[in-house]
UniProtKB/Swiss-Prot annotation:
Cofactor: FAD
Record GO cellular component, one term: cytosol
Classification via PANTHER family: GLUCOSE INHIBITED DIVISION PROTEIN A (PTHR11806), PROTEIN MTO1 HOMOLOG, MITOCHONDRIAL (PTHR11806:SF0)
Source organism per UniProt: Rhodopseudomonas palustris (strain BisA53)
Chief place of localization: cytoplasm
Job of this protein: NAD-binding protein involved in the addition of a carboxymethylaminomethyl (cmnm) group at the wobble position (U34) of certain tRNAs, forming tRNA-cmnm(5)s(2)U34.
GO molecular function: flavin adenine dinucleotide binding
Residues at which FAD binds: 11-16
Record protein name field: tRNA uridine 5-carboxymethylaminomethyl modification enzyme MnmG
Family: Belongs to the MnmG family.
Gene of this entry: mnmG
The protein's assembly and partners: Homodimer. Heterotetramer of two MnmE and two MnmG subunits.
Length: 622
């Protein structure tokens, strides 16, 4: 067997698959290390991809030729565009997935990638020399040499499952944890923290009384994640919605002392925006009920995931809780819910490329960086895999910034501010939401992906055709114009000012849609429907995008002021507090420094002035 690789990825979850695929797409000889190939692409918690903010990340991964979007399309059994009634900037594509179909599609995608070798084994140690990674050692003693390692261990680092008063070591249910790697990180000098997440019970859908719950259909037709997916071919299913009751809340209150989170058994922080049902009752006890989404796990699988009642209460209490919920009174619980604690690294130990500051060639992605969610993991994995391949090949790292995409927002948040609880992506975290929409991820990122060698020939050709068609349609729409009187003949009431307005300008009006301009110019029917959607959104946001472009340019100016190897003790005028924070964080740019807690606008002005003085001094002393 081959024992030398350019890149080795440890872990075959959502981050690991994207990391391995990205590195291999760049031509790096890549190994994906996983305990069992049959678990590659496993959905450890909820059987769904996307959502608010998260759906943006999936589209961005797809724009960079990642796997998740196409795999979700292959496994999706209910697609919904969340926030459809709101503006395009905050809409979030989401898909309910068939667990088996999703995993099978991911495994098939991994098998089909050139330059990628899958090794079924456990990593036990990281091999280093002179401040850089040189290889890994497996639990069976074998060693592999490499130019870069991407660690994507999810919840496996010293994972510990909690169920009521019981606890036992595990990476997820029925799978062993990874112990050796935690020791390796500590030996290198990382201070590891602990985080917690949880999952609800699994139910037998054949024993749910579906007549007692509200049924929720998906969108018709379903909208795919990937631009390369022509249509969704899987049968589409309904999900159910029920609620907890006062009896549910009383039972939880009576037993909350038996929850590991409240007994003191678990000390670590869980995800604020995905709380356990115990947390919901303690924190929001005045509510009459909490929604529960009953999500089927597959087309030929009766298992149902009750989204909204994650818990680690004892098994018998969980059964009692189900008996108080409409539709679930007599359902069979196939597996109890549980909580899991695991090690993580402070993401401020990382550069924006996701390479560790203290160890060249070591990259981290996913839950090890303090995030929660498949989509957050996948986006980090892609960036880490890209940069690991470039590092192994002697190239410079690639940084996606906050104006590039939600993946840039997430990584900047992590490496600049760190985390105190599992990090989840929301649209509210982004400053440039009008620009960073789910519908334009390919317009923002695919050209960058092509430039970095991430994007294959099929997607590159498709992208060029699409961009050419969009540009042509926009030019055409700007060339067609009507007077207010002419528009009135077609039912459009405009200000009678005699000014001719183009089709593109008409589309900017909130009450004017594509069908309205087609009534005036039937020839616009030749524009592809997908292109017409983009054209209308661009027109609606045009004025606002011009303003946001100015904001982005100002942001990029600050990001262009690089703080490389600065001795902050030599910068006059900085407070001791600012010096200490800058020395500890070592921000890459003035822009990143401004996002540190406690760094004032005055301190940023001092830094910018210092950089200008140093720039003037260099030519004089050269």
């Amino acid at each position: 067997m081959q024992t030398a690789f350019d890149v080795i990825v440890i872990g075959g979850g959502h981050a690991g698959c994207e990391a391995a695929a990205a590195a291999a797409r760049l031509g790096a000889r890549t190994a994906l290390l996983t305990h069992r190939f049959s678990t590659v692409g496993a959905m450890s918690c909820n059987p769904a991809i996307g959502g608010l903010g998260k759906g943006h990340l999936v589209r961005e991964v797809d724009a960079l030729d990642g796997l998740m979007g196409q795999v979700a399309d292959a496994g999706g059994i209910q697609f919904r565009m969340l926030n459809r009634r709101k503006g395009p900037a905050v809409r979030g594509p989401r898909a309910q997935a068939d667990r088996k179909l999703y995993a099978a599609a991911m495994q098939a995608a991994i098998r089909a990638i050139a330059n990628l070798t899958v090794i079924e084994a456990e990593a036990d140690d990281l091999l280093t020399a002179d401040g850089r990674i040189t290889g890994i050692r497996l639990a069976d003693g074998r060693e592999f040499s490499t130019g870069a390692v991407v660690v994507t261990t999810g919840t496996f680092l010293r994972g510990l499952i909690h169920l009521g008063e019981q606890s036992w070591p595990a990476g997820r249910i029925d799978e062993a944890p990874a112990l050796g790697l935690s020791a390796a990180f500590e030996r290198i000098g990382f201070a590891l923290g602990r985080l917690k997440t949880g999952t609800p019970a699994r139910l037998d859908g054949k024993t749910i009384y579906w007549e007692a719950v509200e049924m929720q259909p998906g969108d018709d037709p379903p909208e795919p994640f990937s631009v390369l997916t022509a249509r969704i071919s899987n049968p589409q299913i309904l999900c159910g919605i029920t609620r907890t009751t006062p009896a549910t809340h009383d039972l939880i209150r009576a037993n909350v002392h038996r929850s590991p989170m409240y007994s003191g058994q678990i000390q670590s922080s869980g995800p604020r925006y995905c709380p356990s049902i115990e947390d919901k009752i303690v924190r929001f006890g005045d509510r009459d009920g909490h929604q529960i989404f009953l999500e089927p796990e597959g087309l030929d699988d009766a298992t149902v995931y009750p989204n909204g009642i994650s818990t680690s209460l004892p098994e018998e209490v969980q059964r009692g809780i189900l008996a108080t919920i409409p539709g679930l009174e007599r359902c069979n619980m196939l597996r109890p819910g549980y909580a899991i604690e695991y090690d993580h690294v402070d993401p401020r130990e990382l550069q924006p490329t996701l390479q560790a500051k203290r160890m060249r060639g070591l990259f981290l992605a996913g839950q090890i960086n303090g995030t929660t969610g498949y989509e957050e993991a996948a986006a980090q994995g892609l960036v880490a895999g890209l940069n690991a391949a470039r590092c192994a090949g002697g190239g410079e790292g690639v940084v996606f910034d906050r104006a590039d995409g939600y993946l840039g927002v997430m990584i900047d948040d992590l490496v600049t501010r760190g985390i105190t609880e599992p990090y989840r992506m929301f649209t509210s975290r982004a400053e440039y939401r009008l620009t960073l929409r789910a519908d334009n991820a390919d317009q923002r990122l695919t050209d960058q992906g092509i430039a970095h060698g991430l994007v294959g020939a099929e997607r590159a050709a498709f992208h060029r055709r699409k961009m050419a068609a969009l540009a042509a349609a926009k030019t055409w729409a700007r060339s067609l114009a009507v007077t207010p009187n002419e528009a009135a003949k077609h039912g459009l009431a405009l200000n009678r000012d005699g000014v001719r307005r183009s089709a593109f300008e008409l589309l900017a009006y909130p009450e004017v849609g594509w069908d309205d301009v087609r009534r005036i110019w039937p020839e616009l029917g030749a524009v592809e429907p997908a292109i017409a959607v983009h054209l209308e959104i661009d027109a609606k946001y045009d004025v606002y995008l011009q303003r946001q472009t100015a904001d982005v340019e100002a942001f990029r100016r600050d990001e262009g002021l690089v703080l490389t190897d600065i001795d902050y003790s030599l910068v006059p005028g900085l407070s001791n507090e600012a010096r200490g924070k800058l020395e500890k964080a070592r921000p890459r740019t003035v822009g990143q420094a401004g996002r540190l807690d406690g760094i004032t606008p005055a301190a940023l002005g001092i830094l910018a002035a210092y950089l200008r003085r140093e720039a003037r001094r260099r030519p004089a002393t050269a």
